[in-house]
C-alpha cells in the first residue's frame, strides 16, 4: 500500500461557500499550493460524491503524502447517503478531509508517483463543463507531472460555449437576501424620501 485508504461513506460539506447550490455532496474544495494545482489555483474544482482519503496510522518512511484538495473543517462523512437528510449528527466523523493527494516514494534513486482524486465523476463532461473545464485541466496537469519529460504542452479543445459562472450556496443565499429584502427596502426608502419632499413643498 501507499499510506492511504478511502473512507466508506461520502464527504458532505456544511460550509456554504464550499459546495454547489443545494448539493452539499457536490464539493468545491480548497486548492492547496503545489506545482500540480498552479494552473487551477484561481478556479473552482468540483468534486461530486467524493470519499475522504485518509492517511494510515503507519506507512513506509520512503513515502511522502501531500494534500492537493481539501474540505473545510466543517465537513463530515455521511455513511448512509441513500437515506440521508444531509444534516450532521452527533456521531458524525468531522474535520478537514483530503479529496486529492499526491503520493511519492523514492527507493534506490527510483521514484514512484501516484496522484489520487476520490471522485469517480469529476471528469464527466457535465461536471467539467459546469466549471469551465477546470477539472480536466487539473487532470491534464497531474498526468504531465507524472511524465518523465521536461515539458508537455496541453492544448485544450476550443469551445464555442460561454464560460460558466460558478456560484456557491453561500453566494446564492447572499444574492437571494439582496433580491428579496435589500432592493425592495431601498425602493421603499426612496419612495418615503420623495413623499416627504413633496409634502414639504
Regions found by a protein language model. Give the residues of each.
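Acidic, S/T/G-rich, low-cysteine, solvent-exposed domains in lumenal/extracellular/periplasmic regions
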Residues: 1-151
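Short, aromatic-rich amphipathic segments at membrane interfaces
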Residues: 122, 129, 154-177
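Low-complexity, flexible helical/coil segments
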Residues: 150-157, 191-193
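C-terminal target-recognition/interaction regions appended to catalytic cores
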Residues: 179-183
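Alpha-helical transmembrane segments
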Residues: 185-197
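Short, charged juxtamembrane terminal tails flanking transmembrane helices
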Residues: 199-201
